[in-house]
Amino acid sequence: MKNKEIQEQRIKGYFLQATKDLLKSEGLQSVNVRNIADRAGYSYATLYNYFKDINDLVFLCVYDFYGECEQHVREHTKRQERGIKRLRASIRAYVDFFVQYPGIFSLFFMENLGSFKDKGRATEIISFSLDKVCEEEWNYCVSKGILQVEQVELIKSQIRHATLGLLMLYINQRVSFPYTELINRLYLQTNAILESCSPGGGRDGGGVSVHNSLISIKVK
Amino acid sequence: MKNKEIQEQRIKGYFLQATKDLLKSEGLQSVNVRNIADRAGYSYATLYNYFKDINDLVFLCVYDFYGECEQHVREHTKRQERGIKRLRASIRAYVDFFVQYPGIFSLFFMENLGSFKDKGRATEIISFSLDKVCEEEWNYCVSKGILQVEQVELIKSQIRHATLGLLMLYINQRVSFPYTELINRLYLQTNAILESCSPGGGRDGGGVSVHNSLISIKVK
DNA sequence: TTATTTTATGAACAATGTTCAGTATTTTTA
DNA sequence: TAAAAATACTGAACATTGTTCATAAAATAA
C-alpha cells in the first residue's frame, strides 16, 4: 500500500521535472505531452495515468517555481543593506527571474488555469508572489519606522501592479527598449511609489531618502 | 487595376469583420481559420489568398479595436467635469472596455505577435493606448496647472503600468474579487499616484484634491 | 506456474494551422 | 461570341497537439 504511493509520486516527479526543465529551457510553446513524455522517458499516453490533463501537470509546476523565485531573490539580495535598498533589490531580482524565464511568467500570469484542482491556492501564490518575496523587508521597514504600517498595504499593491504591468509589456514585447532600460524604469517607478509615502508630512523630509540612493544605481 | 484593389480590400474586410465579431462575442479561443471563414462566407483556404496567416489577420484587428476603445472612453466620460475627475473616469472606462472584451485584452497584451508585419506600429498603439485615450485630459490638467509638466510623464507611466498590472490579474483570474472591488482598487491606486504629485510642495496642499472627490465615488 | 490486477503503450480521433492541386469563375483575346 | 488565359475559390491532405481507448507488458497474487 505504501510502496505504491511512493512509486506513484516518484513517477509523477519525473513528469513534473521534465515539464519544469522544458518550460525553463524551451519556453511554454514547447511544453506539450509528447515532449514532456520524451524527457520523462515514457509514452505520452502514460502521462494520463498520473495527471488528469496537461493543464494539471503544468500548473503543479507553479509551487516549485515560486520556491525557485523566492530563493533567487534571497540569493541576490542577501548582501544588500537592509531596508529600502534591499527592498528595491528584491523587486529587481523578482523581475530578473521572470526575464530569465519568460515561460514561467506566462504560466504564472497569462495561461488559462482551466479546471486546475486548487486554482485557489495557486492563484494566491501567484498574485502575491512579489509581496511574499519581499515580505521580510516590508516587515523590516515597518518595524524600523521607515514605512508607516497604515500605508504599507497600499504601497505593496502599487508596486505589485506597476511591476507586473511593466513586466508584462516587456516580456510580451509590447515595448522595444533593452533590458537596461527596463531596469531603469523599474527603479524610477519603484522610487516614485516609495517616495510618495515618506513619513514626516513634508516632501523630501521623510526617512526613505529614495532620491539619494537613486544616484548610485548602476544597471548590471 | 483600381477595381481589383477595391474588391480585394472589400473581401479582406469581410474576413476582418468576421474575426472582430468572433473575438468580441466568443473570445480569442474561438478565433480560428474555420470559424472566421464560416462567418465571412468563404472556405478556410480562401483566407490564405488574402492574409499571410491567421496571426496577420488577428493583429490587423488591433487598429480597429483601439479606435473602438477610444470611442468607448470618449462616450463614457464626456459628461464628466474636465480635469482629474474626467481623467479618472477615462481610466475606468478604459478598464471597463477590456473587462467587457477580455479577448481584446489578450490580443493587445498577451498574444505572441509572431511575424506580424508592422509589429512596431501595433505595439506602439497597444502600449500607449491608455496614455492616448487620456491624452486630452493629461493636456488639460497640465494647461490648467493641475499637474506639473515635468511630472506628467512619470505619472502616466505609473498609471499605465499599475492599471495594466491590475487588469491582467483580474482578467486572467489571478484574483477572485468581484468587479466592484476591481473598480475600487483601481480608484485607490489611481488616486494614490495622482496624490503623490500634487503641486505646491506640501502634502494635501496641492490643486489635485483627489481625496475630496474620492468620497463621492460610487461604483456602478 | 497460472490467474489477476496494474501499468505502459501505440493507434486513433478531434481540433487547428497550413499547403496545394484541381475546379469554378471571371476576364481577356481572337 | 467562343476559346483561352488569368484569377478566385475550394476540399483534400498533411502536420501538430490534446485526449481516449483497447490491448500489450509487467507486476502481483493464487
Write out the residue ranges for each language-model feature.
Chain A
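Amphipathic C-terminal alpha-helical segment
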Residues: 96-100, 136, 140, 159-178, ...
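Basic, helix-initiating cap at the start of DNA-binding domains
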Residues: 1-26, 30-35, 39
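Short hydrophobic/aromatic patch on the recognition helix
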Residues: 40-51
